[in-house]
Amino acid sequence: MKKKPATIKEIARKLKISPSTVSRALNDHPSIGLVTTMRVKKMAEELNYEPNQTAIFFKQRRTFTIGVILPSLSEPFFSSAISEIENVAGEHNYTVLMGQSHDDAKRELQIIHTFKKHRVDGILISLGKNTEDLSFVDLLKEAEIPIVFFDCVPKMEAVNKVYSDLSSGMREAIQSFASIGHKNIALINGPENLLASQERAEA
């Protein structure tokens, strides 16, 4: 039978110190000496102690989770992006929750609501090509959940975005065609609701 994780009170009883001392030692509080901290952490490991995530949330107002929403992992760019996001998040002790919208606006919104219920500390989102309703931005602001759009970003202002400089790229492409004598240049663009499409057209 698997041994149940210990509590702070059990660790304190074993070491004959107060529960508050154990709690501070586990959180590396400067008021606790190095020897005591090491004793507490060693006993915590021996007793299979696991921090109460709910208690941590109420104390720090953080869940150490980040939500990522993207169209599809089958696209090489997004599979590389999620890998790097997880690497950086892991370095800062954050866990990444990931959802694929498959360019379905309703599914995208469902994932956003799920992340909100899980009280993620922030959301990274690459919009699906069919997303037009951005009312969720205000919803997340009210819930004090930061949101950053990346790659496929909306036209709206006053939101955090990370995306490529498509205007400069398009101008260089057009100049390249013009330099070899082409005058009638066609553009096959993406959905009008995305900033990327607007920048390509305006270039």
Provide a role label for each language-model segment.
Residues 102-105, 128-132:
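Short beta->alpha connector loops
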Residues 1-64:
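N-terminal helix-turn-helix DNA-binding module of bacterial transcription factors
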Residues 10, 28, 104, 165-166:
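Acidic/polar helix N-cap motif
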Residues 1-3, 14, 46, 87-95, ...:
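Bacterial carbohydrate/catabolite-sensing allosteric modules
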Residues 111, 126, 135-136:
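Short beta-alpha junctions and helix-cap segments that line functional grooves
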Residues 27, 70, 127-128:
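Short glycine-/small-residue-rich Rossmann-like dinucleotide-binding loops
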Residues 38, 47-122, 191, 202:
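Amphipathic helical "hinge" segments at domain boundaries
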